[in-house]
Amino acid sequence: GSGKSTFLRLIGKLQEGTYQGNIRINGILLEEINMDSLYGKMGIVFQEPYLFGFSLKENIIMGRNVKDSDYEAILKKLNLGYLLERFSDVELDTEMVAKLSGGEKQRIALARAMVGKPQVYLLDEITSSLDEQNAREMEEILLAEDAMVLYVCHKIIPELKGQYEMLTF
């Protein structure tokens, strides 16, 4: 590829590497940003999300103090409300995770990022396993967030294209 995913990993300080030029977040050089403060303000979702052998709720809140109403609202916002009944407090085993569609896994991973109310989202191909309707809804949800969204993708919904500030390679 052209380095889009690597670029996101560099910004999230998940990978070290050499590059030309400077990377700044809100005007601050990436090298000068405190790692602890950076991770507390970022929501990161990769193209291939990982789900742990925990309950659905534990997979999303990841030990954070989150009100049940906020957790449920995020699931409903991402069209995952039906999973509340299906997997409420059941631990997700390998077989259950295998039965989830790629789009469901992706939306669960986005819910995990959203529940932390990040200031910056780093998103790598998060709509690639979604049908067009779900991809559109997810993009609209992200565009409505009060956060910076760095979104690596191969295709953007044409009608939403004008709402992005784009960086292309």
Q: What kind of feature is each model-predicted range?
A:
Residues 5-8, 108:
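ABC ATPase nucleotide-binding domain helices that frame the ATP-binding cleft
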Residues 12-13:
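Helix-to-loop junction immediately C-terminal to a conserved catalytic motif
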Residues 41-50, 64, 155-156:
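ABC ATPase nucleotide-binding domain signature
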Residues 49-95:
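Conserved "ABC signature" C-loop
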Residues 20-28, 38:
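Conserved ABC transporter NBD signature motif
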Residues 1-3:
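Walker A (P-loop) phosphate-binding loop of ABC-type ATPase nucleotide-binding domains
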